[in-house]
Each structure stands twice: as structure tokens, then as C-alpha cells.
Swiss-Prot record:
It is found in: Gas vesicle shell. The gene is gvpA. Keywords: Gas vesicle. GO terms for molecular function: structural molecule activity. This is Gas vesicle protein A. It comes from the Bacteria. Belongs to the gas vesicle GvpA family. It comes from Bradyrhizobium sp. (strain ORS 278). The lineage of its organism: Bacteria, Pseudomonadati, Pseudomonadota, Alphaproteobacteria, Hyphomicrobiales. One of its GO terms (cellular component) is vesicle membrane.
Amino acid sequence: MAIEKSIASSSIAEVIDRVLDKGVVIDAFVRVALVGIELIAIEARVVIASVETWLKYAEAIGLTAQPSAA
């Protein structure tokens, strides 16, 4: 079975569709210090996904509110 490489370029719409379908998480921590004195610290978590994708994975790890049984 031969491996085929695709040399066709992706359009921006295809890239955005794939990112929204699969999701991307960026976790960053930046600290700026001068002579051992911390001047600024920035912590950021960025999630890029469609609402459907986020809800699917958020429910799997328990981040969504569970409906109460009435």
C-alpha cells in the first residue's frame, strides 16, 4: 500500500472549517522580570472551536452544568 502525499493547497475556508471542527487550545504563560523582580506575569488559555465541538468535549470532562432532576 503506497502512501500518497497531497500537494494541493488548502483554502482558508478549509483551514477554518478544520480548526472549528477539531478545535485548537493555546496555553501560554509569560513572565517578565528585571534583576529578579517580577514586573508582569500573563497567563492565557485560548480555545478556538465551534460551539458544538466545545460542548461535546466540555460535557466529556464535566465542564457543563448538569440538568437537575425535578
